[in-house]
Amino acid sequence: MPNKIAPIPSPQNEPILGYLPNSNERKALKTELARRKSVIYDIPMFINGKEVRTNDTVDIFPPHELSHKIAHYHKGKTEHIHQAIDTALKARDKWANMHWEDRASIFLKAADLISGPYRAAINAATMLGQSKNVYQ
């Protein structure tokens, strides 16, 4: 049906979880925080769907705990910037020509994952990376 307009879901804020002592969300978050602090993550660049690593890395520390390295990322050079721009420009037309419903469904799927099975992981990463508390 080419003339059909897809229904747009009404926007709603996610419920604010209480993170009360012994609550499931608090246990999940504490587990995820401990897991993320126990690993040093290697963060490559992604260019044209491929992982790109360099010998030039930069360490990442939580702002509230500068003695604890949590990751390092691979620093790009001018050639990486040009490769990334070229790839993005090639993808732009494909994205622009995609039906808006398909583009919207990608963002809705991401929102479902972030608010569902990956909620504790996103919260833990944000808390460690930006020194936020669970309510921020």
Task: List the model feature ranges, each with a label.
Residues M1-I70, K90:
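Hydrophobic face of amphipathic alpha-helices that form TPR/SEL1-like repeat modules
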Residues N55, F61, L66-Q136:
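Glycine-rich loop-to-alpha-helix module at the N-terminal edge of alpha/beta enzyme cores
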